[in-house]
UniProtKB/Swiss-Prot annotation:
Gene Ontology terms: biological process: killing of cells of another organism; lipid catabolic process
SUPFAM superfamilies: PLC-like phosphodiesterases
Top-level lineage group: Eukaryota
Protein name: Dermonecrotic toxin SdSicTox-betaIIB1bvii
Keywords: Cytolysis, Dermonecrotic toxin, Disulfide bond, Hemolysis, Lipid degradation, Lipid metabolism, Lyase, Magnesium, Metal-binding, Secreted, Toxin
Family as reported in the entry's similarity comment: Belongs to the arthropod phospholipase D family. Class II subfamily.
């Protein structure tokens, strides 16, 4: 999975897909009451990027629904995963539950259209810190209360704050989540990051019977040397400001026979068995 990073303006969706991404990440900004308002990162952000691009969240969902719906004029077959980077760290943890309710309802109304949409992308909920786990509880409660629990099959969980992996496991245990879990490891493209935690996550992913990590990705990679390093370690995905660079690296002799781009037929919740 090549995840285009910080794709917050509607016009950026095609831009990143044209560069080779098969997944996009966008930031969800909330008001003080936990209501999702816009797709927006804000300052500071990655080096070399404009931090202020944005869209109304519901309008963004309406557009991305079309982009991921077969036979729609806007349909782009390659886009199979949407990562919602939830900026919960900007609001009180007491509002995390309200935020989870709101995002679930907006996805129901504008993306899935309560069963009337054929939009097919998988959804990855990126939670910044484990203290915000009530967002996940609320999201799942809302799908159940609204009568659409089946959409849980399309939704995965990912904690992005580089916290202790055992601490993350404990929170997932509290929530009763034993599947559909991704684990991110990374830092803004402005800085270098070691591989200790990334290697630990990959080791846990590959441990038989360990159900708290199905996929691991590294972020935000812009240098080809770091992309190569991550691929050699065996990551499932790369988040990048430059998907075209990832494509070029994947075509190199060292990687061409080991990796390919994920398609809709690849289940993002299953561990890869090479």
């Amino acid at each position: 999975w090549i995840m285009g990073h910080m794709v917050n303006a509607i016009e950026q969706v095609d831009e990143f897909l044209n560069l080779g991404a098969n997944a996009i990440e966008f930031d969800i900004d909330f008001d003080k009451d936990g209501i999702a308002q816009i797709t927006h990162h804000g300052i500071p952000c990655d080096c070399g990027r404009k931090c202020t691009k944005k869209a109304i969240f519901t309008e963004y969902l309406d557009n991305i629904r079309q982009v991921t719906t077969p036979d729609d004029p806007k349909f782009r077959e390659q886009l199979v995963l949407l990562a919602l980077d939830l900026k919960l760290q900007r609001i009180s943890s007491a509002k995390a539950y309200r935020a989870g309710e709101d995002v679930a309802k907006k996805l129901l109304d504008h993306y899935w259209q309560r069963g009337n949409s054929r939009a097919r992308a998988y959804i990855l909920l990126n939670i910044p810190l484990v203290e915000d786990y009530e967002f996940i509880r609320a999201f799942k409660d809302t799908l159940k209360n609204e009568g659409y629990e089946s959409y849980n099959d399309k939704v995965g969980i990912n904690f992005t704050g580089n916290e202790d992996l055992d601490k993350i496991r404990d929170v997932l245990e509290i929530l009763g989540i034993h599947k559909q879990v991704w684990q991110a490891d990374g830092i803004t493209s402005c800085f270098a990051r070691g591989t200790e935690r990334l290697k630990e996550a990959l080791e846990k992913r590959d441990t038989p019977g360990y159900n708290y990590i199905n996929k691991v990705y590294a972020w935000t990679l812009v240098r080809k040397s770091i992309m190569r390093r991550s691929l050699r370690l065996g990551v499932d995905g790369v988040m990048s400001n430059n998907p075209d660079r990832v494509i070029k690296v994947l075509k190199e002799k060292e990687f061409a026979d080991k990796f390919r781009l994920a398609t809709y037929n690849d289940n993002p919740w299953e561990k890869f068995r090479g």
